[in-house]
């Protein structure tokens, strides 16, 4: 059997030993990371108390299998706070991290369906293409843009 096991995770529980051990059995990990900025992380992910972005990033880096990073790009407001992980600064920081961890792929996608946060924008196809062109110039990792 040549089947490969891939696990999809939002990456928030990788710091727990049992979870990390189970996920480590996979050949590939689709690991969610929308930002490298702690303030944006709080707005986008609304994490449980005590869960910190640097911990998530540490454990993404430690994942022993092939890493595929998934990033949801969004812009607008959430709970009255401005959010935009499509800025050059945000994308450059993500590109640097994705390169550093030697991911085999970086999947970037927009909001696909209505969200409880009505002030979040869905990126147009043209905006997604622009994001793809920009990040490809700043990483050696293959980038897949989903529409």
Regions found by a protein language model. Give the residues of each.
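Conserved AdoMet/S-adenosylmethionine-binding subsite of the radical SAM
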Residues: 1-109, 114-121
């Amino acid at each position: 059997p040549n089947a490969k096991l891939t696990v999809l995770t939002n990456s928030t529980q990788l710091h727990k030993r049992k979870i990390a051990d189970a996920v480590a059995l996979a050949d590939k990990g689709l690991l969610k990371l929308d930002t490298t900025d702690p303030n944006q992380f709080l707005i986008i992910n609304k994490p449980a108390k005590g869960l910190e972005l640097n911990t998530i990033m540490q454990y993404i880096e430690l994942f022993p299998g092939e890493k595929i990073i998934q990033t949801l790009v969004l812009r607008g407001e959430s709970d009255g706070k401005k959010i935009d992980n499509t800025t050059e600064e945000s994308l450059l920081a993500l590109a640097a991290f994705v390169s550093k961890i030697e991911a085999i792929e970086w999947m970037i996608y927009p909001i696909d369906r209505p969200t409880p946060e009505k002030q979040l924008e869905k990126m147009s196809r043209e905006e997604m293409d622009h994001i793809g062109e920009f990040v490809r110039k700043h990483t050696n990792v293959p980038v897949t843009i989903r529409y």
